[in-house]
């Protein structure tokens, strides 16, 4: 199992951030000899219906496409660019459509995501059926991560995220399966121990870690464990809850989608 096709996004209005935005998708494309496609559109346009680009925006998109193609070509990568003018639907829908026929999306962001970025991330994760790697701009992955922390709660979303991350897990020097033991009750056969056995059969080097949630949230505890173990990436399932449920009980998924990231997180729903 590998990544044969990787999808990413470039905002043509942020040319100074292009190098950071493409660092991880290009590094992964190089590592897996994958084809990489960049969808190019202003992030703020995710809030609006598709319209013909004006001359200024069109020029920026052309420049972004040329710069991406030149960088990919220098690295010997099979690549493609698609601009907003080729989309028949909104940007979130268009990204999800393209992602369904890709193996992985890599989206790089700076700080806490705005509404437009949240819409794009939400569509990518919940409408595509494919894994999505969210990467903080300040902490891109220049290579395949060597230590990965997997959040395991025995949910369908969690196992989909793990299978989506298998090409990375198989290459990592160590994968840590972490269960927050006082978050959800797991039946026999659902524990992280069984999961370590499955991943070992796939050739992964794994170990199990039981965590106590404590007074903070689940994501907070997982990020603390990632820091303690020097993990370079977190893998977790994404679950869509109602706004009221998020407000009253909180949600690790909602925290990921609304807060600034401190390390790359791969999600799948």
What are these regions (language model features)?
Residues 1, 70-105, 202-234, 239-244, ...:
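Structural beta-alpha unit
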Residues 35, 42-86:
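N-terminal positively charged helical leader segments and presequences
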Residues 1-10, 16-23, 27, 50-51, ...:
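Membrane-embedded alpha-helical bundles that form conduits across membranes
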Residues 76-81, 121-125, 146-153:
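Acidic/glycine-enriched edge-of-secondary-structure segments
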């Amino acid at each position: 199992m590998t990544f044969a096709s990787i999808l990413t996004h470039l905002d043509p209005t942020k040319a100074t951030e292009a190098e950071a935005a493409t660092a991880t998708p290009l590094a992964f494309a190089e590592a897996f000899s994958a084809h990489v496609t960049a969808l190019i559109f202003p992030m703020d346009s995710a809030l609006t219906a598709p319209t013909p680009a004006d001359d200024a925006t069109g020029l920026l998109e052309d420049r972004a496409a040329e710069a991406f193609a030149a960088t990919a070509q220098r690295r010997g990568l099979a690549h493609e660019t698609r601009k907003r003018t080729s989309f028949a639907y909104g940007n979130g829908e268009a990204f999800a459509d393209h992602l369904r026929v890709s193996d992985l999306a890599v989206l790089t962001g700076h700080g806490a995501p705005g509404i437009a970025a949240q819409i794009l991330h939400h569509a990518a994760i919940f409408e595509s059926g494919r894994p999505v790697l969210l990467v903080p701009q300040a902490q891109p992955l220049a290579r395949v991560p060597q230590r990965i922390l997997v959040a395991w709660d025995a949910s369908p979303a969690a196992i989909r995220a793990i299978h989506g991350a298998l090409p990375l897990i198989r290459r990592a020097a160590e994968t840590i399966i972490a269960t927050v033991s006082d978050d959800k009750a797991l039946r026999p056969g659902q524990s992280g121990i069984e999961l370590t056995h499955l991943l070992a059969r796939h050739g992964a080097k794994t170990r199990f870690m039981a965590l106590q949630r404590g007074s903070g949230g689940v994501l907070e505890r997982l990020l603390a464990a990632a820091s303690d173990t020097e993990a370079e990436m977190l893998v977790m399932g994404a679950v869509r809850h109602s706004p009221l449920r998020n407000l009253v009980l909180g949600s690790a998924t909602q925290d990921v989608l609304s807060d600034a990231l401190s390390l790359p997180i791969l999600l799948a729903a």
